[in-house]
Amino acid sequence: MNISSPAMYTEKEASSKRYKYAACIILILIIITYSLFILKKDALHVDEVLSFVISTYNSYGFKKNFNEGIIYTSSALKNDMFGYDNSIHDILDDIISLRKNNRDSPHTNFYYSLLRVSFIGSHFSGIDTIMLRAGILNICISIITFIFLYRLSLIIFTTDIARITCLILAFFSPAAISTVLFYRPYQLQTLFFYYQYFFILHNNK
């Protein structure tokens, strides 16, 4: 059969549609799975605490110590460490401060700035508030990551089975789920890796 014949073109087009439908189903399952895990999360790792303290540019919990002569309530401790003002002016001030010095030299300020923006429209009423916002942010980053890997799989693999397997392994592995649940810049790092890889291959294919 001639590879340019209508029959071959129709077969290839049908295969592409199957992959698109499968990818949509996988993405929906990813969002549901990640959301369920995030809703079940009830504690923070010490590094995650650092993410929130840095993003809101608070001093307590970072360089400023609590007064040893004062007995604090748990609510007061949480408010001093995680409290924030949700006004646009204060958010911009924090982002500018993060740009000048994010106080975490191994990482850029980008994730912390996104985390700060994610608090728009909310008031600190407990750790659950910021955990939920951070979880939604990581899910949004995962969706963008999924789009780039979807496009990347079209370049790397030639069969739908290989592409679907790639998406499943990349987003349903224990490591992938753990990264989404860990509120640090690593999910954003994964996104940039796929973006860079896609950009290189897309421009050299």
Residue ranges, per PLM feature:
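Hydrophobic alpha-helical transmembrane segments
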Residues: 21-25, 113, 136, 164-168
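Short acidic/glycine- and proline-prone juxtamembrane loop motifs at membrane-interface regions
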Residues: 181-186
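Transmembrane signal-anchor helices characteristic of membrane glycosylation enzymes that use polyprenol
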Residues: 18-86
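Membrane-interfacial, low-structure loops and terminal tails that flank and connect transmembrane helices
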Residues: 1-16
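Transmembrane-helix signature of polytopic, membrane-embedded enzymes
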Residues: 128-132, 149-172, 190-191
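Interfacial juxtamembrane loops and adjacent helix segments
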Residues: 56-107, 115-131
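Specific aromatic-rich, kink-prone transmembrane helix
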Residues: 117, 148, 168, 172, ...
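Transmembrane alpha-helices of multi-pass, membrane-embedded glycan-processing enzymes
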Residues: 102-107, 111, 115-122, 134-148, ...
